[in-house]
């Protein structure tokens, strides 16, 4: 497979920065935070409604941790199609959690909300490399 290059945006923070990437979820544009420390890709419980209906969720018996919060309730959803550039991920089973704390912080910074977090499950599977200098996510 040839390399696929996807532009990323560096959002400057007081104490560092966040990496943001635009992908497609079921054909619609989605804005995700790239988090190499996140074990899996997750979507916000409110924002995912832009991509699929709530009846597509099922309760997840496991509590999720991370993203600067304590344990949180989660749901599972199946996304028919995630597009990372030319890569198509079909029937992706994802965790849906409350990311409102991230979006409230983004709102205070006058930034658009994120739809989810692109985690290391997808990054690793597709051998992703982040080129900070060129502001690119490279999929091999």
Task: Please state what every model-predicted region is.
Residues 1-140:
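Pepsin/retropepsin-fold aspartyl endopeptidases
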């Amino acid at each position: 497979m040839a390399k696929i290059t996807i532009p990323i945006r560096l959002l400057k923070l007081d104490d560092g920065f966040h990496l943001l990437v635009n992908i497609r979820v079921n054909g619609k544009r989605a804005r995700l935070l790239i988090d190499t420390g996140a074990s899996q890709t997750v979507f916000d419980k409110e924002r995912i409604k832009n991509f699929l209906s709530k009846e597509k969720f099922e309760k997840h018996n496991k509590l999720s941790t991370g993203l600067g919060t304590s344990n949180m309730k989660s749901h599972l959803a199946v996304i028919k199609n995630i597009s990372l550039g030319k890569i198509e991920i079909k029937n992706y089973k994802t965790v849906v959690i409350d990311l409102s704390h991230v979006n409230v912080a983004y709102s205070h910074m006058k930034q658009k909300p994120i739809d989810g977090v692109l985690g290391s499950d997808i990054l690793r599977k597709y051998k992703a490399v982040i080129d900070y200098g060129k502001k690119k996510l490279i999929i091999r």
